[in-house]
């Protein structure tokens, strides 16, 4: 016969949610930092190609 599982405590649920949110926050910070370095032209570890269309638009 099927038996329902025990309920997860509020504290355990809150800890898991906090860990998940912190991982998302770290990814957000890293992506924003990379975007800033690309826009300012100081990126050392990220290489990308520019096309003629892009360079004509900036002039």
Swiss-Prot record:
UniProt-listed Pfam families: Ribosomal_L32p
GO biological process: translation
Main location: plastid
Keyword annotations from UniProtKB, A to Z: Chloroplast, Plastid, Ribonucleoprotein, Ribosomal protein
Stored SUPFAM superfamilies: Zn-binding ribosomal proteins
Subcellular location: Plastid, Chloroplast
GO MF annotation, one: structural constituent of ribosome
Record HAMAP family: Ribosomal_bL32
Family recorded in the similarity comment: Belongs to the bacterial ribosomal protein bL32 family.
UniProt-recorded name of the protein: Large ribosomal subunit protein bL32c
